[in-house]
Amino acid sequence: MSTGRPRPPIPDTYAKALGDDDPVEAMAEAPDRLRRLVRGLTDRQLSTKPAPGKWSIKEIIAHLADGEVILGSRYRFIAAHDRPAIQGYDQDAFAAKLGPLNAKAADLIDDFAMVRAANLGLLERLPEEAWERVGLHSERGEESIRKLVYMYAGHDRHHVAQIETIRTGLFPKAGRRTVKAATAARKPKRPARRRPR
């Protein structure tokens, strides 16, 4: 069983966002961080794009929820099949065509939290050797379950920081305390999950 971070390493942006934090704990706390970040914002604020071609807060949350659905299928294919092909997807098409601006932010976060909980449950019950199994991503090549866990934990943190930037940049009076509380490191309230090795 390998220890430490996955090889090859995850993208720098995500590695920096995660730092030395436990990726499973980071993934477990992400839905609550999102809930705190959107508290006090109106639907109009949540739907406001910070610039042309950039996603709104709701679109970012929908992206996290959509990504979690796809991630769950990747975990399952990799765990159950030998070196399965893992297809990339067009995240901008998802944002444009799946109607995130027509949803309530709280519902999008609930969707994300539900799928995330199911995926964390799967990770907890997988045998340890499954974490080293790989799939062949159409754009990035070999990816193990371990690498996906680290990458998506950093991906969450990256987008939480993006939401914080949008919130404080566009809506500075919406409550700085909420933003500060949302981005502060917290331990999940549930029992700790098995740590990646």
Predicted segments, located by residue:
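Short, contiguous alpha-helical
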Residues: 1-13, 47-92, 120-121, 128, ...
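Short, intrinsically disordered, low-complexity terminal/loop segments
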Residues: 194-197
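Acidic/histidine-rich alpha-helical segments that form the ligand environment
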Residues: 25-37, 93-132, 152
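Short coil/turn segments at secondary-structure junctions
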Residues: 14-19, 96-106, 143, 147
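A glycine-rich, hydrophobic loop/mini-helix early in the fold
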Residues: 29-55
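Amphipathic, non-membrane alpha-helical segments in soluble helical-bundle scaffolds
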Residues: 20-31, 54-61, 105-109, 146-149
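Short, charged, low-complexity loops and linkers
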Residues: 9-25
